[in-house]
A protein has these predicted regions:
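N-terminal loops that bind phosphate or other acidic moieties
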Residues: 1-167
Length: 167
């Protein structure tokens, strides 16, 4: 609730209520069955992983690992000089299992540079071990203007990022 709740529209006063409700559900379920709430990924997608595991018998696994394995992503990355990726917001959640953060880590492990485009960036210093450079649309124009004309501002931001790559 504390990590993803605000991103999904949960107000500050509602976070403790949601957290308490989810903890209660996890406690009730663990008394009946297992400690699924402790499984990595059980809190992802608003607790969808937990619910599907408990009530439908689904196996929780990393979506990034699944798809990167299917696409043979490490082999593809090793054949290139750089990776360019993007996300609406780059922040501390980016490196907590989100696909774009996992891609950046994989690129670094493959000795490949990784660049990112985003709508906005929070705490760029924390992201610097994973990305060679990041560019945000809101650095060029106010957030509302960027949202209203995202394609234009994304193109300009990508152009600026390309100049950084060429240096």
């Amino acid at each position: 609730s504390h990590v993803y709740g605000p991103q999904k529209g949960l107000g500050a006063k509602d976070i403790p209520l949601a957290e308490a409700a989810l903890r209660r559900l996890a406690m009730v379920w663990s008394k009946q069955n297992s400690s699924a709430s402790k499984l990595p990924g059980s809190g992802a997608a608003g607790g969808l992983g937990f619910g599907l595991h408990c009530f439908a018998g689904a196996k929780i696994e990393s979506g990034f690992e699944l798809f990167s394995g299917m696409a043979k992503l490490p082999q593809l990355i090793r054949r290139h000089d750089l990776v360019i990726t993007g996300e609406g917001t780059l922040d501390r959640q980016t490196v907590m299992g989100k696909g774009v953060g996992e891609l950046a880590k994989m690129a670094k492990n493959c000795d490949c540079d990784c660049y990112a485009l985003a709508g906005k960036i929070e705490n760029e210093k924390m992201l610097s071990p994973y990305f060679n450079e990041c560019a945000a649309l809101v650095d060029l124009t106010p957030s509302r203007k960027a949202e209203a004309n995202a394609a234009i501002w994304l193109e300009r931001s990508a152009g600026n990022l390309a100049k950084q790559c060429a240096i």
